Regions:
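Helix-loop-helix "hinge/cap" segment bordering the ligand-binding cleft or interdomain interface
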Residues: 117, 144-220, 237-288, 342-378, ...
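Short alpha-helical segments and helix-capping/turn motifs at coil-helix boundaries
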Residues: 21-25, 76-83, 99-102, 134-137, ...
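Generic, well-ordered alpha-helical scaffold segments in large soluble proteins
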Residues: 58, 62, 80, 84, ...
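Extracytoplasmic/periplasmic substrate-binding proteins
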Residues: 105-106, 215-237, 262-426
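Conserved small-residue motifs centered on glycine
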Residues: 8-10, 15-24, 42, 366-490, ...
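Short beta-strand segments
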Residues: 39-41, 212, 297
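Conserved N-terminal structural module of periplasmic/extracytoplasmic solute-binding proteins
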Residues: 1-186, 236, 245-247, 351, ...
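Loop/turn elements at helix/coil->beta-strand transitions in domains of secreted/extracellular proteins
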Residues: 34-37, 63-66, 88-93, 112-114, ...
Length: 533
């Protein structure tokens, strides 16, 4: 059906916004006439494909709306969004953006974002149901002024919460008669054996014992390795000590971790390109037919293997968090998204705002979530059948076609763009296979690897990923954050590569960190944490 041919039936007026009558909860179309919504979408597909996308058409026809898309590529979406707000040329609705808590407060208090509280109370039945189920979520989304300015996409993903993983080539371990490393010393010996023992059997010393990449999902080696010395998520570098916010990167344990990683690097056990290569560079090494990669830090192993080389990933298993020389170990824990994709701006009319919040409410339903991620029923997925069991051994609610993972064209879904509500009940209700290394068994494999090695190994207290500050504090923290984090990352690489020495240059490094007003930065975050708690 043409996306402009929207069927209409019946009206039940529960109130009006302008001249358009907005229907009650659960009634579709949403209004007594079609409403056009101009929305910003950071999109992994072209605008033309998005307009003709089957899920787009499904939402438009179901809700009686017409999308007018303002798009940016996934790589430029963050920058584009910031430029739109800076210029004032933003649309009425941000549907797939990346609004951080600081930006939500800044734009909200400047009047650029509409508070959503009243709209949710009036039109957001599904949102209110979710808030009742998860009161901590509503608390986390509420800014210090009491307003909710944006909504996140909810994806309760166990392996994502513990995505800071090291994957190791177990066929190499078996060939060299090595055990899975559990300590930093054991990892050193394993990597040394990978370098010297010719585990790929080609007679050349071409093995790369450990690699990673920059600017991809948990591919930086320092996140996993440093957490054998002090907590490090490679994001804000905070650790918690009895309610006190501290900076890992100024502690003696950080220095010890840098010295350890430098040892690995100086002995050729770490890929020399690890601080410069992109994910594409890591993939090129992972899929080489002569099998040169011993281990890699990456959120999930299929990120490194394309569909043509998917069988190679079967050789890799996760390494548990390593125990360091002082007996410390920690799994990185990422409890939630650090940003929110959905907001309504001051450019929206009352009609558009009412329709937009009902759009958000619908996208949070299971019906919309399943179709958003997996497309129409009976193509890529169907309901479960007798004998199919889920992650917990219960009758499966859904079954996913194994061909979904290798399909190159999927213009019948949004693939998690926009809003969705994929809680653990939904994620873990899909049928699992007996073979965790098969395409259809991959989600089950990630679940089991995470459960085996990482769950409950995080510190008892971690700094929240999603936290609000008041307007002035958010502005100040934003100004301090970039130079502090850039300084930490630059010096981290210099210490690891041997440009700086942890014995002779450490004190100067710490002094430089404090000159960037680290004390004030921690003070701001401490105040925000106290308010959050």
């Amino acid at each position: 059906m043409n996306r402009d041919s929207i069927p209409w039936s019946g009206t039940t007026s529960v109130g009006s916004a302008g001249e358009v009558v907005i229907r009650g909860p659960g009634e579709y179309p949403l209004a007594d006439q079609r409403v056009e919504l101009e929305v910003f979408m950071g999109s992994s597909i072209a605008k033309e494909e998005l307009e003709n996308n089957l899920f787009t058409t499904y939402v438009e026809q179901k809700l009686g709306i017409h999308f007018k898309f303002m798009t940016a590529s996934a790589n430029t979406a963050d920058e584009t969004e910031k430029l739109l707000f800076a210029s004032g040329d933003y649309p009425p609705v941000i549907l797939n953006g990346n609004l951080t808590p600081d930006e939500q407060v800044r734009y909200g208090q400047r009047g650029m974002l509409r508070p959503l509280n009243g709209l949710i109370d009036r039109y957001g039945d599904r949102i209110k149901e979710i808030f009742r189920q998860k009161p901590d979520l509503q608390k986390a989304l509420t800014a210090s002024d009491g307003n909710i300015y944006a909504l996140p996409s909810i994806n309760e993903c166990l392996h994502c919460w513990y995505a800071q993983k090291l994957w190791i080539n177990t066929s190499w371990l078996n060939k060299l008669d090595l055990d899975m490393p559990k300590t930093t010393d054991e990892l050193y010996r394993v990597l040394l054996a990978f370098k010297q023992g010719d585990p790929n059997g080609n007679g050349l010393q071409d093995e790369i014992p450990l690699s990673g990449a920059m600017n991809a999902w948990h591919t930086e080696i320092t996140g996993f390795l440093m957490s054998a010395f002090i907590y490090n998520t490679d994001t804000n570098y905070f650790y918690m000590d009895n309610g006190v916010v501290g900076m890992s990167a100024e502690q003696p344990q950080w220095r010890d971790g840098l010295a350890y990683i430098h040892k690995l690097f100086s002995e050729g056990l770490i890929d020399p390109a690890v601080f410069t290569q992109s994910l594409d560079g890591l993939i090129e090494k992972a899929i080489r037919k002569d099998n040169v990669l011993g281990s890699l830090t990456i959120g999930h192993i299929r990120m490194a293997f394309d569909s043509l080389n998917g069988n190679m990933q079967q050789e890799y298993e996760t390494v548990p968090p390593l125990v360091g020389p002082a007996g410390y170990r920690a799994a990185g824990y990422f409890s939630s998204s650090e940003s929110a994709p959905f907001a309504i701006t001051d450019k929206a009319t009352d009609t558009e705002a009412a329709v937009a919040i009902r759009l958000a409410d619908f996208l949070f339903t299971e019906e919309a979530t399943v179709r958003n991620e997996w497309g129409p029923e009976d193509k890529w997925w169907r309901t479960g059948r007798s004998g199919e069991i889920d992650e917990h051994g219960l009758p499966a609610k859904y079954w996913l076609n194994p061909d979904f993972a290798t399909s190159l064209t999927q213009n019948d879904l949004w693939g998690q763009m926009g809003l969705l509500y994929r809680d653990r009940n939904l994620r873990e209700s899909w049928a699992v296979t007996d073979d965790p290394h098969s395409v259809s068994g991959y989600e089950h494999r990630l679940y089991q690897e995470t459960l085996k090695n990482y769950v409950n190994k995080e510190p008892s207290e971690v700094y929240p990923d999603y936290i609000f500050m008041d307007g002035e504090a958010a502005e100040e923290a934003g100004r301090l954050r970039a130079p502090i984090n850039d300084y930490i990352r630059t010096n981290m690489v210099q210490f690891i590569m041997g440009v700086k020495d942890t014995k002779t240059d450490w004190d100067d490094y710490v002094d430089g960190l404090r000159e960037l007003k680290l004390g004030r930065y921690l003070e701001i975050h401490q105040k925000a944490y106290n308010a959050f708690k």
